[in-house]
Amino acid sequence: MKKTLLFLIAATAMMMAGCSNDDFGGATQGMTLNATVEQPASRATMTGPNDGPYQFSFDNDDKISVGNTTLTSDYYIFTKSGEKFSCATAKPAGTAVDWYAYFPGTTVPLDNQTGDLAGVANYYACAGKTAQATTGANGLAISLTPKVAILRIVKVDNSSTPCDINITTTGGWISGMTAQSSVADFDVETSPSKVTLLSQTAAGVYYIAVPAGKQITIYNGGTKLKATKKGLTAGKYYTVTTGPVKGSATINNTTETVEWVQLWAGGPKFATQNVKDKMTFADATKTGDDYVWGKNWRTPTKEEMTLVNAKLDGHFYSITPLHTTCQIDEESGVVGLRYTGIMPGYTKQSIFLPFDGNKDYLYGNYWTSTSEIATCGTSLDVVGGISDNVDIFPAYYFNPQAYTLETTKYYVRPVLAE
């Protein structure tokens, strides 16, 4: 659904002696234009965890370029202060003409965007015109519509996958947009050489504006990610990941594979199943070819197993999302905890950790590879159950004093060794 940006421009002429005005034959100081934004959205927000409309509203110090079909000088620049835009040097036209408005200006460079959600609003190119010709002496009303879409780039890790976003369209590599003269639209500027729209090294979620309605091909570090035939819809946002968020890897140097999923950008890649048998801490912390599944896998650290926030609140632990949600679930007749990603690009990814017991009373322990106290291991200890359709947890914590005896064996959920 296209988001329309609407603002009203009210024009007033102030009379002062000593300043000539050839259009009106009188002595005036000029014309002041005030603009009021009718869009109630915040500066820049998304309407959901995945693709959907991108909401925008003007902020203080935003500028709009306004001109008409007879204006031979530069565009009038209106600046927002409080609830209104104003331009003290703007003047009404001598005859009824069409007026055009462009945000954030008549030129919008798209290279080297910052990637943050608030900053992408500065590249949110919009254009509009008056519904009918007017001098503007009694006020202007202009409805602006977006001419760009928003790409939400999910960089999946900190090092192995680059984030160097370049986009092509007919004519070359996209570099920016330029307002069309006396048309409520922008032309797409291209370059024969590669142009970087976004470059980031840290895992995370980043946002860039790209021309809407144009066939584009998206590249990351020279690798083709996506291509569109008709172009993206103006005013919407689309999620693109720089690498896979699920896959598979072999175990024990055989052809047998185990699937993995990543639950947040920069997070570990969890196997979708446990090691078959419970393990001692000594075996769980082996690495390389000595590891139970071979060198492609390892036991996660305490930090990597910290998927949610858990805080003791009275007699029970309060569980709130950190990287994932957590809920008691059942899979193939086995009770356990379902962890589902909450970061954009990961909301469809989840892992299921089986526990002993049933939905009314589940319990169990998972090893981490972390040792915080000499001769002890660190385990995730959980006791929980469902009461009156509510998940409750008498225990959900990391135990830094877990025994490392040969008789102490816990579950292990490996992660990919990278």
Please give the residue ranges for each predicted region.
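Short consensus segments that form the blades of beta-propeller domains
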Residues: 52-57, 288-291, 402-405
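Short glycine-aromatic motifs
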Residues: 78, 124-129, 260, 297, ...
